[in-house]
Amino acid sequence: MSAEAPKRQFGDRRRGGRRGGRRDGEEKGWTPVTKLGRLVKAGKITSVEQIYLHSLPVKEYQIIDLLLPDLKDDVMKIRSVQKQTRAGQRTRMKAVVVIGDSNGHVGLGIKTAKEVASAIKAAIVIAKLSIIPIRRGYWGSNLGQPHSLPCKVTGKCGSVAVRLIPAPRGKGIVASPVVKRLMQLAGVEDVYTSSSGSTRTTENTLKAAFAAIGNTYSFLTPNLWAETPLAASPLEVYAEEAAAGKKRY
């Protein structure tokens, strides 16, 4: 008798995991093509805060994989979009992905492709490249770790406006499911939200909430008014190391 065919095994299909994470050995085979990528791989830059401090553009998602290894992603919405052509309607799939480490970093990616898997994979890459820092704060006394936002912030996209309001410790995230997931991946534990407009449009609602939470770094609170010396940019400090790995033809 012939042996039975092995059963097909499926991977972990739970949401919120590392769906677009790097494979084993992919990081080792990464060859940086930018100065920032070469400095990160060489260990000269060890945190994303150094990148944010000098507003350095991130062009390679592997940089984020190295500096933020605990990222989690979640697919918020998948829908079909159509375009009218001479041959008829062309249908493609659009994916909206949120990514974050629940520790002050969050990103949003939107991508359209012919297949769902391709759209999700590309949206995860876009979300990694768009990761921004979040400034967290307190509702009342400055006891323990920051749990909320430092002040009220507002974001707008299309007709949707989302306002985030600090909440007392233990209140939780009072928001719609999509905005709540964005706050969780950003690391905000307690916050009130208020939204207006066509909030049924998930994409615009997420964009408005993402713009609002990103505004926490658009100003300085009084406790940050003290002058601090600005360090030199890593691209200037390690200029020779950054140029050494560049291929010359």
Curated annotation (Swiss-Prot):
Keywords: Cytoplasm, Ribonucleoprotein, Ribosomal protein
Source organism, top-level taxon: Eukaryota
Gene Ontology CC terms: cytosolic small ribosomal subunit; small-subunit processome
Compartments (UniProt record): Cytoplasm
GO biological process: positive regulation of translational fidelity; ribosomal subunit export from nucleus; translation
Keyword Cytoplasm: yes
Record GO terms (molecular function): small ribosomal subunit rRNA binding; structural constituent of ribosome
Annotated InterPro entries: Ribosomal_Su5_D2-typ_SF (IPR020568), Ribosomal_uS5 (IPR000851), Ribosomal_uS5_C (IPR005324), Ribosomal_uS5_euk/arc (IPR005711), Ribosomal_uS5_N (IPR013810), Ribosomal_uS5_N_CS (IPR018192), Ribsml_uS5_D2-typ_fold_subgr (IPR014721)
Subunit architecture: Component of the small ribosomal subunit. Mature ribosomes consist of a small (40S) and a large (60S) subunit. The 40S subunit contains about 32 different proteins and 1 molecule of RNA (18S). The 60S subunit contains 45 different proteins and 3 molecules of RNA (25S, 5.8S and 5S).
Free-text function comment from the UniProt entry: Component of the ribosome, a large ribonucleoprotein complex responsible for the synthesis of proteins in the cell. The small ribosomal subunit (SSU) binds messenger RNAs (mRNAs) and translates the encoded message by selecting cognate aminoacyl-transfer RNA (tRNA) molecules. The large subunit (LSU) contains the ribosomal catalytic site termed the peptidyl transferase center (PTC), which catalyzes the formation of peptide bonds, thereby polymerizing the amino acids delivered by tRNAs into a polypeptide chain.
Name by which UniProt lists this protein: Small ribosomal subunit protein uS5
Source organism of the structure: Candida albicans (strain SC5314 / ATCC MYA-2876)
Higher taxonomy: Eukaryota, Fungi, Dikarya, Ascomycota, Saccharomycotina
Gene transcribed to yield this protein: RPS21
